[in-house]
UniProtKB/Swiss-Prot annotation:
Composition bias type Low complexity, residue spans: 258-274
UniProt-annotated stretches for the region Disordered: 258-293
EC numbers: 2.1.1.179
Other remarks on this protein: Protects M.olivasterospora, which is an antibiotic-producing bacterium, against self-intoxication.
Annotated family: Belongs to the methyltransferase superfamily. Aminoglycoside resistance family.
Its job: Specifically methylates the N(7) position of guanine 1405 in 16S rRNA. Confers resistance to aminoglycosides.
Residues holding S-adenosyl-L-methionine: 47, 80-82, 86, 111, 134, 160-161, 176, 185
Compositionally biased residues, Basic and acidic residues: 284-293
Annotated protein name in UniProt: 16S rRNA (guanine(1405)-N(7))-methyltransferase
Organism: Micromonospora olivasterospora
Length: 293
C-alpha cells in the first residue's frame, strides 16, 4: 500500500496497523487489501483535494513575500477537502471558540489537515505554542514552516491517533472532523477511550453533511457527541452552528477529578478545551473504497 503514490508519505505505523488489522480479519489477500484500502480512504484519501504539503509551502512563501495571512491561508486550505469546507465561516467559527475558551497559550490540533492555516483567525496569546498532528508526513514537515510567518511556535509530526493520542496538557485541543473517522477505524468504544485520553473536553464540532453533501447518516450530531462524551466526566452546556458544522461546548461535571464545577458556561481553569469536528448526518464518501487505489 505504501507503494501507491497517494499513500507513500503516510506514517508507516499507521499503514502497518491497518495492514495488520486487515490480515487478522481476512485470510484472502484480495479481501484484506480491499479492506485496508477502504480504511486508508476513510482516514486520509477522502479528505485530500489537492497537494496539501505544496499548498502549505506556497502559503508560507506568499506570506513571507508580504501577502495577507488570511487571504493566503484561505486559498491554501482548499487543498484539503475537510479544511476547505470551513473557509466560508472561519471568522464566526473561531470567534465563538474564543468566547468559550478565551486566549489560549497552547493548542494541540489532532488530525489537523490544513486547519493550522487558520491560526490568523484564532484567539491566541503572544508566543503561543501550536502542536499539530496528522498521518501525512510531508504535510507535517511543511506545517512546521508556519512558525516562520505566524506569531506562534509550531510543532508538527505524523501520528496515528487511533493507536495513541499525544499528551494533551494544553489550553485548547482541536479535533476537527475526526470522531466519525475514529468510529470507522475502531468503533464506539475506541471513541470513548479517545475522549478520555484528551483528558478534558470542552468543545465539539460536527459536520452536518459529508464531503459529497449527501445526507443519510444513521447518527445525528447530538447522538455522536453524547456517545463520545458518555463516561468521560464532561457535559454539553452550550452549542452553536455554522454552515454545515455544529459546535458543542463541554465542561467538567461537578466534582470530577477532585475539582469543583466551574461557573455556569465557563471552562474549568487548567483544563484542556478541544474543538472536535466530524461528519455526523450524512453518509460520507469515505465509506467507498478509493477507486484510484
Amino acid at each position: 500500500m505504501l507503494a501507491a503514490a497517494k499513500y507513500r508519505n503516510l506514517d508507516p505505523a499507521f499503514v502497518e496497523r491497518l495492514a495488520q488489522e486487515a490480515a487478522e480479519r481476512f485470510r484472502d489477500r484480495g479481501q484484506a487489501v480491499k479492506y485496508a484500502k477502504r480504511k486508508l480512504h476513510q482516514a486520509f484519501g477522502a479528505f485530500v483535494a489537492g497537494t496539501p504539503a505544496q499548498a502549505v509551502a506556497a502559503c508560507v512563501a506568499k506570506i513571507a513575500a508580504g501577502a495577507e495571512p488570511k487571504e493566503a491561508g484561505r486559498e491554501a486550505m482548499r487543498a484539503h477537502a475537510s479544511s476547505a469546507e470551513r473557509v466560508d465561516w472561519l471568522e464566526p467559527f473561531y470567534e465563538r471558540v474564543a468566547q468559550w475558551c478565551g486566549p489560549a497559550s497552547s493548542v494541540i490540533d489532532l488530525a489537523c489537515g490544513l486547519n493550522p492555516l487558520a491560526v490568523p483567525w484564532m484567539a491566541l496569546a503572544p508566543g503561543a505554542t501550536y502542536a499539530c498532528y496528522d498521518v501525512d508526513r510531508t504535510m507535517a514537515e511543511a506545517l512546521r514552516a508556519l512558525g516562520t510567518v505566524y506569531p506562534v511556535r509550531v510543532n508538527a509530526a505524523a501520528v496515528d491517533l487511533v493507536a495513541a493520542v499525544p499528551a494533551a496538557g494544553v489550553d485548547v485541543a482541536l479535533v476537527l472532523k475526526t470522531l466519525t473517522t475514529v468510529e470507522q477505524q475502531r468503533g464506539g468504544r475506541r471513541v470513548a477511550e479517545y475522549r478520555r485520553e484528551l483528558t478534558a473536553v470542552q468543545h465539539h464540532s460536527d459536520g452536518a453533511r459529508s464531503l459529497s453533501g449527501r445526507r443519510g447518516y444513521a447518527d445525528d450530531p447530538d447522538a455522536i457527541v453524547q456517545r463520545a462524551v458518555h463516561g468521560t466526566g464532561y457535559e454539553v452546556v452550550d452549542e452553536a452552528a455554522f454552515g454545515t458544522e455544529a459546535l458543542y461546548h463541554l465542561v467538567p461535571l461537578a466534582g470530577t477529578a477532585g475539582r469543583p464545577a466551574p461557573a455556569e458556561g465557563a471552562a474549568e481553569p487548567g483544563a484542556t478545551r478541544p474543538v472536535v469536528d466530524v461528519p455526523a448526518t450524512a453518509r460520507p464518501d469515505a465509506d467507498r473504497v478509493d477507486p484510484t487505489g
